[in-house]
Amino acid sequence: MSKSLDADVRRLLDAPNFAALSTLMPDGSPKVEPIWVGREGDHILIATDRRGVKGKNLELDKRVALSITDFGNPYEQALIRGRVIETRDDNELVILDRLSHQYLSKPFPRRKWSTRVVYVVEADVARYYKSPLEHTPA
């Protein structure tokens, strides 16, 4: 059952905030890594190399979990559980360049790819949380 993303979750996805992506390894153990994320409507976009561990994991098991933390306030976050519903080739780096502009303000610098893909994720659960705590490290 897909979940519409509320305005706060969309805002965190649309800003240059890193997400922690959790996928499942072939043996069932979790793998977590920081990634860039994009959005199309209520879908989350994950750009990667199909041959990498992340791509291989997503080909084997479509389930994902994402934690997106606000870059300026680590006590503001979105938590998403969902699944890959579509895989798109992105060898021309159209989506990756869009994400790169979001995070680096320029096209993606490494241009030689032959197995770039974008995984389109549909959220089954999407929650937004903002703590009243203030981030004031010593």
Model-inferred region functions:
Residues 1-18, 138:
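Extreme N-terminal tail/first-helix region
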Residues 2-4, 75-138:
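Charged, gly/pro-rich active-site loop segments
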Residues 10-11, 36, 56, 108-111:
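Short secondary-structure boundary/capping segments
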Residues 13, 57-58, 99, 121:
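A generic structural signal for nonpolar/aromatic side chains embedded in well-ordered alpha-helices
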Residues 16-50, 58, 64-68, 79-80:
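Short beta-strand segments
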Residues 27-29, 70-74, 112-113:
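A short beta-turn/loop motif at secondary-structure boundaries
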Residues 53:
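Short alpha-helical
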